[in-house]
C-alpha cells in the first residue's frame, strides 16, 4: 500500500491553500495547482494567499499551472467547486496513473445530473480511485494549524486508512471510513440547512428558533441519508452532525452568512456578494432527489422556494410553524 508521499492540491483558493499547508505539515511533498495565471503568479512570488491574508505557504510547496505536473502525484485533492469538478476530473483522466486516488473536497451535488462528487470522478476518470474529504473545517482554522478533525472516505478501507495517515498532522486529525455516500451526503445536505439557519439568525428570531431549525435540519439530513444508503453512524459523525453544527452556528460559513443576508431582507444578488454559496445550487437538487425517494424535507422545501422566488422569508417561516403537529422522530 502506498504511503502517498506526494500529494497535489488542485485549487489555490482558501480551502486548497489550507489543505496544501496541512499536507506539507504532514511531511508530504506538495504541489499546489492553480488555473488562474494571475493568482498562481501571486502565490509563487509572495507565498501568500489572497484569500487568507497573513497565511504563508510553506517553502516546500511547489506552485504550478501545469496540470500534467500536478497529476504525477500519488494522490490528488480536488479542491474545486462542485459544479466544475466534472471538467477537472475529465482533464485529469489521461494524465493520472492507474488507481490514483482523486479526493473530492467540495460539498455539493451536481446540478442537472444529481451526481455526488465521487460519482462524477468514477464517471469521468475511471482509472482513478474516488474518495471524499469532508467534515467541520473552516479554511482559516486549518491554515493556521488550529485543531480540526475530518473524515476521509473511500470504498477500499486500506486506501481510506492510508489517505488519512498521509494527511495526519499534529493539528489535523482525519478519521477514515468506507461510507463514501454517507460522508459526501452529509456535506451536501448541511449546505441547505446552513442557509435556513442563517435566515433564522438574520431575521433575529432568537436562539430557541436557531436551535430548533438546526435540530430539525439534522432530522432531514438523517431521513435523506437513510433513503440514499448512508450509515447512521456516519450521519452522527463529523461529516454529518459535526459539519451541520458548525455551519449552522457562525457567519464564517458562506451558506450561513448567505442565509443571514436573506433573513435581513437582501436580494439573492446582494446576499451572494459576487459568489453564490454552494447551498444555492444544492437546494433544488436536494429537493428533487428527496421527492424521488418520497422523503419529506420541509426545511429544504422552504429554502428552495425562497431561493427560487416562490416564497418570501416570512411566508416560508410561517409555513413551517403552521404545519400539522406530529410526534417527534
UniProtKB/Swiss-Prot annotation:
Assigned keywords, A-Z: Cytoplasm, Lipid biosynthesis, Lipid metabolism, NAD, NADP, Nucleotide-binding, Oxidoreductase, Phospholipid biosynthesis, Phospholipid metabolism
Gene3D superfamilies: N-(1-d-carboxylethyl)-l-norvaline Dehydrogenase, domain 2 (1.10.1040.10), NAD(P)-binding Rossmann-like Domain (3.40.50.720)
Pathway involvement of the protein, from the record: Membrane lipid metabolism; glycerophospholipid metabolism
Gene Ontology CC: one annotated term: cytosol
Statement: the UniProt record of this protein carries the keyword NAD: yes
Disulfide bond annotation, renumbered to this chain: none
Reactions listed under catalytic activity: sn-glycerol 3-phosphate + NAD(+) = dihydroxyacetone phosphate + NADH + H(+); sn-glycerol 3-phosphate + NADP(+) = dihydroxyacetone phosphate + NADPH + H(+)
Top EC group: oxidoreductase
Keyword Plastid part of the UniProt annotation: no
Positions annotated as active site in the UniProt record: 190 (proton acceptor)
Coiled-coil intervals, chain numbering: none
Subcellular location: Cytoplasm
Pfam families in alphabetical order: NAD_Gly3P_dh_C, NAD_Gly3P_dh_N
InterPro entries xrefs: 6-PGluconate_DH-like_C_sf, 6PGD_dom2, G3P_DH_NAD-dep, G3P_DH_NAD-dep_C, G3P_DH_NAD-dep_N, NAD(P)-bd_dom_sf
EC number(s) from the headed UniProt entry: 1.1.1.94
Residues that coordinate or bind sn-glycerol 3-phosphate: 107, 135, 137, 190, 243, 253-255
Family according to the record: Belongs to the NAD-dependent glycerol-3-phosphate dehydrogenase family.
Functional description taken from the UniProt entry: Catalyzes the reduction of the glycolytic intermediate dihydroxyacetone phosphate (DHAP) to sn-glycerol 3-phosphate (G3P), the key precursor for phospholipid synthesis.
UniProt cross-references to HAMAP family, sorted A to Z: NAD_Glyc3P_dehydrog (MF_00394)
Protein name as catalogued: Glycerol-3-phosphate dehydrogenase [NAD(P)+]
